[in-house]
Amino acid sequence: LGILGFLASVLTENVVLVFYSIKLGGMGLLFPIYITVAHRMFPFFAGNVVPGYKLWRPLSWLAAVWAFALLHLGLEMANAMRWLWLADVPLFGLTTYATWRWWPRGRMPGLLAVLFYGVAWIPLTFALYSAQSLILLASGEFVLGRAPAHALFIGFFGSLLVAMVTRVTQGHSGRPLIMPWAAWFAYIALQIVTVLRIASEVTTDAYLWYAIVAIGWIVALLPWVCRIGWIYLSPRADGRPG
């Protein structure tokens, strides 16, 4: 539906359809998928490498997050921005608690750490959404612009994209499960890009920062993409078929 909405917006030049397609693709599709993967897999990964780690993966928590995420989506689609806090305050509480429960208390390797650093963007996202909605409700002023969305899209989605693709690429190419330099560079650079993009929403010369952030995306991901592209076109490092 989101893709169809975007295509329709291009054909009809209706910018409202772009808004709907982004919301459907973000909170309606990507967020439920990403948060479900985090809920099921990240504690499992931690349990395999961190001594004494206790898994915490209640389905009731996941169901509650899905329900409030759909409420958030519905309110956004209805343009009820001043009421988003009804979904986002609970989501902030749920994701903050989960981040605390999931976080390994012992030493963890880099390839695991980047997963949890990425997860930390979720409560920050809903803190920004909650603040934005409550300020709008109280004063009628819409502040922060798209900062909450960029915390979600670049901070959370972008971080976990690099972390998970690196993990799968290393493992399925017969390489050790470590964060290579290109992945570290991409990951750290994305954190900087996220902060700059959020900050650009409250600066006076926003278009300058848009350009800086766009270049930042390319600089961050190009070495990483080149490396994994080379791996995909090469035989497995351990000599096994595949």
Where are these predicted regions, by residue range?
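Alpha-helical transmembrane segments and their membrane-interface exit regions
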Residues: 27-35, 90-101, 216-223
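Accessory "access/gating" subregions that flank catalytic or transport cores
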Residues: 69-73
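Generic alpha-helical transmembrane segments
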Residues: 89-95, 152-163
